[in-house]
Design a protein with these regions (language model features):
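Domain-level signature for soluble enzymes in the chorismate/prephenate branch of the shikimate pathway
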Residues: 1-380
Length: 380
């Protein structure tokens, strides 16, 4: 037989499979109608487990895993169809509806905003992108930014979560597990690192370079080209620039933003020294209370899933079944819980779509712990 003959066989089989799949989904919808009429839940976990075991036992050993995966997905699709018919709701969906109805139409222009660092830090530049004229309060640590929000000292906080070169800011993701907050907006900020020193300093004079660990990582190739130079970590890039300005020395420099040149009376010895020219950091704006502004098309979630095979797959298959795009998946180990993780998800979906509402009704039941962090727009 030729390849075309095999493909014709596959096409014929696919036609039969599709007809049976449509028939199966139609019966699943009728079951959903019955469950709705008799006030029954969409999920019958015992029946699903028994059915999957029966399928696994009857399948050829070489195809057992494939068969179980296929039927697991079909069960997810059937349940999603039934949930839509049942109009699944939860306290979370009610909370989201309330936030949409009571959030003002315009994002605030002059609020009190906490950020880590000092004047000239990239977090402060992100504040300026998010707000017209923010009243910025500087904190020594990211932890202090979260605390300022929880205690009501500031309405908002701005924190970095990931960089296009260096990846996720793990310290921030770890703090997310310890604090109560909501995300109300995000921004992507172009990061352009300069090597700054006191007036009169020459590149050949530099013996020490100060900066934040993320900036150091983003400029690794440049730093490797400077043999004999010691790299010193600081709490943030602007603090590094300030330290250089106050040192009285011409043999030290800082990797910091161009804004620090005028702020601290420094000069640029080298510009755009990051490894990648297309270098962006994503910041999120956090608040104590849930606010959902018009146009929200991104959602962030945190989940602890049951510690058993297939738990993550069940969540991902929900996204797939509802046609919801996953922008980010991050996992962080849970403190004092061996080999267990908190999963962080960023989803691309309109907060107004029926698929989003259905997802928010279904997901909490799949998790040991579930946190809806917010739905928001990203400024680019």
């Amino acid at each position: 037989m030729e390849l075309s003959d095999y493909r014709r066989q596959i096409d014929d089989i696919d036609s039969q499979l599709l007809a049976l799949f449509y028939r199966r989904m139609d019966v699943a919808a009728q079951i959903g109608g019955y469950k709705k009429a008799h006030n029954l839940p969409a999920l019958d976990a015992g029946r699903e487990r028994a059915k999957l075991q029966q399928i696994a036992d009857s399948a050829p050993e070489a195809l057992r895993d494939y068969t179980v995966s296929l039927y697991s997905l079909m069960f997810e699709l059937s349940r999603s169809c039934q949930n839509r018919l049942l109009g699944i709701t939860s306290p979370l969906t009610a909370e989201i509806e309330h936030a949409i109805a009571h959030t003002p139409p315009l994002f605030p222009e002059h609020p009190a905003v906490a950020c880590q660092g000092v004047e000239g830090a990239y977090s402060q530049l992100a504040c300026d992108r998010l707000f017209t004229l923010p009243n910025v309060f500087y904190c020594a640590t990211f932890d202090a930014v979260f605390s300022a929000i929880e205690k009501g000292l500031c309405r908002y906080g701005v924190i970095p979560v990931e960089n296009s070169t260096a990846g996720s800011v793990n310290a921030v993701y770890d703090l997310m597990m310890r604090h109560n907050f909501r995300i109300v907006r995000s921004v992507r900020l172009k990061i352009d690192h300069c090597l700054l020193a006191r007036p009169g300093a020459q590149m050949s004079d530099i013996k020490e370079i100060y900066s934040h660990e993320q900036a150091i990582s983003q400029c690794s190739r440049f730093l490797q080209s400077l043999p004999g130079v010691t790299v010193v970590r600081c709490e943030n890039t602007a603090a590094a620039a300030k330290r250089v300005a106050e040192s009285g020395r011409t043999d030290v420099a800082a990797l910091a933003s161009r804004a620090c040149i005028g702020l601290y009376g420094l000069e640029s010895l080298a510009a755009s020294v990051q490894d990648q020219g297309n270098n962006y950091t994503r910041f999120v704006c956090i608040a104590k209370d849930l606010e959902i502004y018009p146009g929200a098309d991104r959602t962030s979630l945190m989940m602890v899933l049951p510690h058993k095979p297939g738990s993550l797959y069940k969540v991902l298959s929900r996204f797939y079944a509802l046609g919801i795009n996953l922008n980010k998946l991050e996992s962080r180990p849970l403190p004092e819980r061996d080999f267990e993780f908190m999963f962080y998800f960023d989803l691309e979906t309109s907060v107004y779509s029926p698929q989003f509402r259905q997802l928010m009704g279904e997901l909490p039941g799949l998790c040991e712990e579930f946190s809806y962090l917010g739905s928001y727009q990203e400024v680019v």
